[in-house]
Amino acid sequence: VGADNAQNQLLMGALQTAMPTLPNIFEMAGDRSLMSLALKGDAKMAVGVNAGIMWDINKQWSLGFTYRSKLRMKVNSGSIALKTIDDPAIGQILGQLLQAPQFSTLQNLSSAVVKTELPLPASLTWGVSFRPTPKWEFAVDLQYVLWSAYDRLDVELVNPTDNTTVMTLASDKNYSNTLAVRIGGQYRVCDFLTARMGMYVDESPVSSDYLNPETPSMTKLAYTVGLTLRPTRWLDIDLAYGYVNSADPERTGSYPYTNSVLELAGVGAAQATTDFSGNYTARAHTFSLGLNFRF
């Protein structure tokens, strides 16, 4: 609760109906959030299918295709904690407000359990590799990810006693299907050493109207290098480094956010909804180590 000045003014008016002598706690809090919800839960095991086929056309060309099915990761008994600002004076005021009838829902949150599910999208991948000489190999992969399965996220806060819904935190996602392109090459220097280099472009499934800090939310451009050391006939050591950056230096967008406390206070849904805007950039350094044993 907090952040948007227009909504804060609406909420102050609603709160003062419950406590007419209420001081302006938003001014007292400054940039700090008055209340927040901390949700925690472990997803149940989900079962999916991976299937693929490889065709070695000749010694130079190979084609491949893989399919990965969609999974739905479900959380049925997550926990929730209602946290208030670390300020004794404001905390005392909030404690009194939570006793008001219109905020009775908030009183029941700490004993509620979290139920939600998150889809992991299906994907289709096509690949081709070309070996012009015994030492050189080049490859191209196209991966089509069916992100449209992630159209919304509903988090239900449920009373465990009678299994009734205390509150639903609903958010539209409206993800779009995406295409990722990966290209790379490797050179076998000798029996002991193989060197690799590559890059990929991974399209963002999120439109600017629904841009938020979650991942994946930006089109990513990555460069990779790696090598394989083969000290013995039965052991390979793989080392790799990748630099991931956003395709745009900075991406600007917004996300429709509904203030649930405003709705509880009786403010209409239209007034309780505002845009959470921001400018985003992303970069990462990745390192990997792999060991392959042959028997």
Which role fits each region the language model picked out?
Residues 1-295:
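Outer-membrane beta-barrel porins/channels
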